Amino acid sequence: YGCMEFGTMEDDYRELRIPKIVRWAASLWLQGAIKDTGYEDVESYWMRKDVKALTEDEKNNYSPLYYIEKNLTKENSPDILIWHGDADLDVPYLQSERLNALLTRIVGTDKVEFKLFHNYKHAADQLYSDENLGILKEYLDEKFA
């Protein structure tokens, strides 16, 4: 649901060619909360730290990818389902692609399923369609029933 690598989101947005003004407009609901905090971007606001000033060690301390790489093995991993929308302006889908790549390298493709939804935004209502909930139910029944 959130960022996987703090300090890389700006690079992701540039790679995806999503300008700041578009991201700003998409996150207007959050801008009021950020405005009076002294943080200049959403990522720093969520972290309550200026992510541009973090050292590599500090970034690792906050990175789920770092903990996954350090602690997860094929033997101790649960089955993992990753869904992300390619129109997400809050968390670039490249974050989930890196998560998927790391997980499949560590635990294998049989334990990780990744689906990128076309034109879905962050926490999009379409994720909760009858069709998608049916897919989710089938996945849970298959893996955990």
Describe the predicted segments one by one.
Residues 1-6:
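Active-site nucleophile loop of the alpha/beta-hydrolase fold
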Residues 86, 96-110:
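Conserved loop-alpha-helix segment in the C-terminal half of the alpha/beta-hydrolase fold
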Residues 9-70:
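Mobile cap/lid helix-loop segments that gate and shape the active-site cleft of serine hydrolases
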Residues 78, 104-123:
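Catalytic histidine neighborhood in serine/cysteine hydrolases
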